[in-house]
Amino acid sequence: MAPCGRVRSRCPGPALLLLLALAARPALAGPPAAALQAGPGLNAAGQPAQGAAPGAAGPRGARGGGGGSGGGWKLSEEAVCREDVVRLCSKHSWANNLAVLECLQDVREPDNEISSDCNHLLWNYKLNLTTDPKFESVAREVCKSTIAEIKECADEPVGKGFLVSCLVDHRGNITEYQCHQYITKMTAIIFSDYRLICGFMDDCKADINLLKCGSIRPGEKDAHSQGEVVACLEKGLVKEAEENDPRVQVSDQCKKAILRVAELSSDDFHLDRHLYFACRDDRERFCENTQAGEGRVYKCLFNHKFEESMSEKCRDALTTRQKLIAQDYKVSYSLAKSCKSDLKKYRCNVENLPRSREARLSYLLMCLESAVHRGRQVSSECQGEMLDYRRMLMEDFSLSPEIILSCRGEIEHHCSGLHRKGRTLHCLMKVVRGEKGNVGLNCQQALQTLIQETDPGADYRIDRALNEACESVIQTACKHIRSGDPMILSCLMEHLYTEKMVEDCEHRLLELQYFISRDWKLDVVLYRKCQGDASRLCHTHGWNETSELMPPGAVFSCLYRHAYRTEEQGRRLSRECRAEVQRILHQRAMDVKLDPALQDKCMIDLGKWCSEKTETGQELECLQDHLDDLVSDCRDIVGNLTELESEDIQIEALLMRACEPIIQTFCHEVADNQIDSGDLMECLIQNKHQKEMNEKCAIGVTHFQLVQMKDFRFSYKFKMACKEDVLKLCPNIKKKVDVVICLSTTVRNDTLQDAKEHRVSLKCRKQLRVEELEMTEDIRLEPELYEACKSDIKNYCQNVPYGNAQIIECLKEIKKQLSTRCHQKVFKLQETEMMDPELDYTLMRVCKQMIKRFCPEADSKNMLQCLKQNKNSEVMDPKCKQMITKRQITQNTDYRLNPVLRKACKADIPKFCQNILNRAKDDTELEGQVISCLKLKYADQRLSPDCEDQIRVIIQESALDYRLDPQLQMHCSEEISSLCAEEAAAQEQTGQVEECLKVNLLKIKTEMCKKEVLNMLKESKADIFVDPVLHTACALDIKHHCAAIPPGRGRQMSCLMEALEDKRVRLQPECKKRLNDRIEMWSYAAKVAPAEGFSDLAMQVMTSPSKNYILSVITVGICVLFLIGLMCGRITKRVTRELKDR
């Protein structure tokens, strides 16, 4: 090159060279012979040049050269180099000095060392080539048209030797083939030694000494291989950025010189001498067919950098060059060339920015990505280059000085030894996610910045670790999506936790999504569909701009707040944006770490309550379970998310996946609606116990129901239907169960009082009914009952499933064994269910078809009454009949559990059974005492007609099934077990047990049991219908002899007794036998149980076999008394009239 003084006067330092961008690898053939044959210290004619440096002519005896064609001086004929040339260079190149020079300076060291004298000769030859003005004439001849086009070079003074320097400086703009070849060869010569680079020595002398990059004088190192010094300075520049150590700082002038040298060598890897020597073998191994020039060899080597067979020294050299590219994009020839017009078009290199900032690769990528995301057109060549370098940054963390600077501790502690193919970055991501320890805020910010720079959300292939881990999943689950499409990531998220997902892909995907979820711009599809809405509603700025008022993480929160607004609330999202917001919400529901706000506010609570919940989706469920225990900020976030889920349960992606079969079968209509509004969850709840329902779905639906109980806002439809009623009638009540109780109590009171206008609105009453029915299915949905009975459930119903109200049914069946508090709650529940049988989940489930058959139009409150009336129908389902009997048994334990009886006997109960009521407790059964009392009064025929009708039915039913008589069952349990075990074990009860007890009356020892059996006998006298065995035996006789006599009040029984005494009447043998048995029983009963009143006495007389004799005696007695009265007159003293009239 020309003397540096002239060049630096035009443009200080190596800044003169800023315009170079492109070059092609030189051909082996050199420029015109005159230039190529000139030797050190010689002119073009081969004569010694004036002013040649001492020793320029080379060693003694080598002057005047000859031996070349045309008699020109040849390097190959110099004695000091002849042996090296013959040994190292092919014979056809000996005649060409530049070819020999290229051969010798590309020698593999230290395998084939060149002699010291030859090295010195080469140095002087190269120095002359770069400083001798006589070479200018060759350049003017070869580059005539190029010089005319480049004004700066045309203006250089003639004969001063500055022209070659100028042409090297503008090599990228040279299009003339021969000129380009000549100048490229000159550049290769210059770049072989830093001292030959114009200005480099002056700019970097102090830095070379500071960084100890080697001697600046020829000596220990070969004079022509001083490219190692430049490599050392490059490493110093890189180290400065990575360590931020004030003791190791490269001066600004030298920094510019280093980057300019790297830029000038960007087109041909031969020009980076250190990299060339380090990677020659690897070039042959990996890039043998790659033509040199335009940075192609560099790119090829970059692509193979992490191959196992890549040498370590080459990998280090490539990494250093990549780090320089990261500091100045112009060090990449292909990137600078492909993106030149786009950078200018989108003002990515405006003058007012600091040079160090706009030159950074990250700034270029961010600026051009911003244009792409705004929908601007960036050339495909430039986008291709951007993709390559984004992939490069993701592949090797060491190319990002911020990562090394901020994450050094995390790398050493958690990620050592994972330097290849992006594994270190993913390891750091894993640490940030909290899976391998804690991470500093600076490291997290550096990672977030790198993810924004590389933008892997736009193309998954940028993340090599993810690409390799997920290749099989993409080929199977996402093969319908074009390779590189941003929707690939969404597709992978949709298949997260499915059988198609592989574990390694799952980890890499979640690690990347953690960062994408923290900056809405990194989700390309979301940004594309929502940038208008975000600008309008959330006041966001450009893609690569940030705002303190609206940080990236807050934008999505703003969007989803608007996504679920009603039309009345206004300012809603566009349909496309809303769909994307829902997609993101679905993804976030899979992992709590994908929701930045949730993880930030709930970090302490997650550690406190959910440290053991590591399975998919368990952390959010755990937070919901402990909602009342969470700190305020976390509780608000979880509450808002749960409220959102109640409106659109499809956000719960894992639940939706588990429930897919049931949705397709039973809920496809509501699932297809774009606006959910809680319909889908309601449908799932209603079909929770279908046989198609799988366990995962049922558990998920039940869990959501349990969460809903914590706050009525979590039931979207209930909230929307009743929020005004709640504010008016139930203020300050939060829990759903309390709101339901408050509203249902209000509705019941208004109904009982026949209020003209209900205080609870019609739409709320309808939804309230839905909520009440849903709560009956699982005891956990009734928190007060569940809390009261927890210990009893553990003791008695431990293996019983919660669903289908099975626990509630279990508690009902063992009611007598329950703790007092639980017993009371169960009694209250039964009282409610008997008043409104539709709330009896088990009854409604078991008898669903029978209700459709027998009670399609029955009011819900009369449902059980209707079923009881049809219980003995031939087409009644046995299971339903059994369930009706169970409810009848329950009703007969206490009149309060039989609303119809309670209403019919409203006046009779306090009149006849007050003493029992006085002993009664509100929450404890009377064990049938009131009903037994009413039965006795029924026998005395003293009840009101309505009450009598109800008691008759109860007597008839209990006569067929002893279990319907709680007093009998309680007092005669031992007798039934010992005397009537076979009858009690019968599947169908038809009065056999009662008959057995009557027959064995004499064997009964227990007084209370005997009394109950005697009461049965007494009841049977009142009406034959209450004695099923006798009624069955005498059915034909009643039809023949007593058809005209209406039933009731013992009339048909008296008719049969008269027929038995009438000799003219022949009764059926069975009937006659049963009647005689009854008479004997009644006779014994009369002896054992004396009449308690006149009515009992009269009944005993009427049913006695000596009825006529007794009546005759009574009549005679009365007549005798009458006659005595007539004959004996007054017994009292007579009184005079005067005394009477006083």
Swiss-Prot record:
Query: What keywords sit in the KW lines?
Result: Cytoplasm, Cytoskeleton, Glycoprotein, Golgi apparatus, Membrane, Repeat, Sialic acid, Signal, Transmembrane, Transmembrane helix
UniProt-listed PROSITE patterns:
GLG1_C_RICH
Give the Cytoplasmic membrane side ranges: 1130-1142
Instruction: Name its cellular compartments.
Output: Golgi apparatus membrane; Golgi outpost; Cytoplasm, Cytoskeleton, Microtubule organizing center
Q: Fetch the Pfam families from UniProt.
A: Cys_rich_FGFR
Q: Where is the signal peptide?
A: 1-29
* Region (Disordered) location: 45-69
Q: Which InterPro entries match?
A: Cys-rich_GLG1_repeat (IPR001893), Cys-rich_GLG1_repeat_euk (IPR017873), GLG1 (IPR039728)
Composition-biased stretches (Low complexity) = 45-60
Q: Name one GO cellular component term.
A: extracellular matrix
- What are the TM regions of this chain, as residue ranges? 1109-1129
Instruction: Give the Extracellular compartment stretches of this protein.
Output: 30-1108
Write down what this protein is called: Golgi apparatus protein 1
What does the entry give for GO biological process?
bone morphogenesis; negative regulation of protein processing; negative regulation of transforming growth factor beta receptor signaling pathway; protein processing; regulation of chondrocyte differentiation; transforming growth factor beta receptor signaling pathway
Report which gene this protein is encoded by.
GLG1
Known glycosylation sites: N128, N173, N544, N640, N749
Q: Would the keyword DNA damage turn up in this protein's UniProt record?
A: no
